[in-house]
């Protein structure tokens, strides 16, 4: 290991460059493990270029806005990214044949989801705790905020604020937190969905530009 100087710089690009040299020489091999009976390894971030997913559409619920607490970004080849509380706010990326990983969003703009949002130029995203406290302490204000996001999302403007309260008044806090966060986020992602999906996909699969070369157990 004396051939590699990891102390020369704390910057990730430099460290990743040294790890790339060590991997090519088979001196250091990082491995991402999973519990399985049959192991097949795939090289990640080594020579083969990353294949970006292609964004196709988004929806605030597969049936309608009020029927579910989640929202989806869809991509080509049956790719979908589901956002919801479970019980923490998170995103799960699901492909046609396999699940590709999760990202947490509970801590707002400083969470993994928040980091991806920052990567596309978005600087605000509330924490789930902030929204939960608002629901508990200022319920009317929360519904006014949710209704504003609902209208900004292009949903049915014939639905009034009172209609929304009647439809969602009996939903628990976790449901409301989820719906607000995903609607807030989708409104700010308008026009940036492709870049967000690409960055989130890379992050969840440990194939981001900051990720080092490694073997992944499939």
Task: Please give the residue ranges for each predicted region.
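Short, positively charged
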Residues: 1-218
């Amino acid at each position: 290991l004396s051939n590699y100087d990891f102390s020369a710089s704390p910057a990730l690009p430099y460290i990743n460059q040294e790890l790339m040299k060590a991997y090519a020489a088979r001196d250091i091999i990082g491995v991402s493990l999973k519990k399985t009976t049959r192991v097949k390894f795939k090289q990640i971030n080594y020579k083969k270029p990353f294949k970006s997913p292609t964004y196709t559409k988004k929806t605030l619920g597969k049936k309608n806005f009020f029927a579910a607490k989640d929202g989806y970004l869809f991509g080509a080849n049956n790719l979908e990214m589901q956002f919801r509380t479970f019980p923490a706010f998170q995103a799960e990326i699901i492909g046609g044949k396999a699940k590709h990983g999760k990202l947490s969003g509970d801590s707002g703009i400083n969470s993994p989801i928040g980091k991806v949002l920052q990567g596309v130029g978005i600087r605000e995203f509330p924490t789930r705790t902030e929204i939960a406290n608002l629901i508990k302490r200022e319920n009317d204000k929360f519904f006014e905020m949710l209704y504003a996001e609902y209208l900004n999302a292009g949903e049915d403007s014939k639905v009034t604020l009172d209609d929304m309260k009647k439809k969602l008044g009996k939903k628990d806090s976790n449901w409301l937190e989820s719906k607000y966060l995903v609607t807030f986020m989708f409104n700010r992602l308008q026009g940036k969905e492709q870049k967000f999906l690409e960055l989130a996909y890379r992050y969840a699969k440990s194939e981001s530009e900051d990720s080092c070369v490694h073997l992944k157990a499939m």
